[in-house]
Amino acid sequence: MTNIISIQSTVLNDLVGNQAARYVLGSKKYNFYEIPTIILTSHKAHKNSIQLNSKNLNPLVVYNYLKKTYPLQSNDLTIIGYTPNLITAKAIQKIIRKQKKILLDPVMGDVGIGLYINTEVANFFKTIVCEASYISANFFEWSYLNDKNTTNYTLDDLCKDLKIFAEITIGFSGRCYFTENCSKFLES
């Protein structure tokens, strides 16, 4: 049976993040291992959401304990989602170095809203996009990762950028198209 490691928000009463992934993938009989980046009582869009355990929550510690307990492998699909801060991002980066199949869902913002995470974390996503095997980004997120403005990002340019990403993920040996500083966080 296939293992899936999901590293994203755990929202107790809404179907987003780890809850959504478990709902969709659990019915497919995958072994699903959940690592929270943040724990919320409800989606942050609700004004009365409470954040739990934020200070001691370290995805790398949870990952290391899971690896000791369950038969996880470096080629297991690893989903990276909502990342609340740079400390969590750096912990996730260490997990990415150990895992080979990364699905990046860079939960960062939306058209008409802009970024709803801090710029440091958004720029972190720019550095790890080169390490991802797959990406699930909305138009705003994809534009941000490519340093493009959503108002003048043409369909032709979008298709070219998607093609370049595909070439990179199948072993393209050129420089990372997304940012000149792709190794900035990988070296820290």
Model-derived regions: residue spans:
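Conserved N-terminal subdomain of the carbohydrate kinase-like
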Residues: M1-G109
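Active-site glycine- and acidic-residue-rich loops that bind
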Residues: Y82-A89, G112-V121, L145-L155
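Charged helix-capping and loop-helix junction motifs
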Residues: Q93-K94, I117-K126, T150-D156, C182-S188
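Short, acidic/small-residue loops that bind anionic groups at enzyme active sites
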Residues: R97-Y116, N123-A132
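A generic structural signal for short hydrophobic patches within well-formed alpha-helices
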Residues: G109, W142-S143
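Conserved phosphate-donor
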Residues: Y134-S136, E141-W142, L155-S188
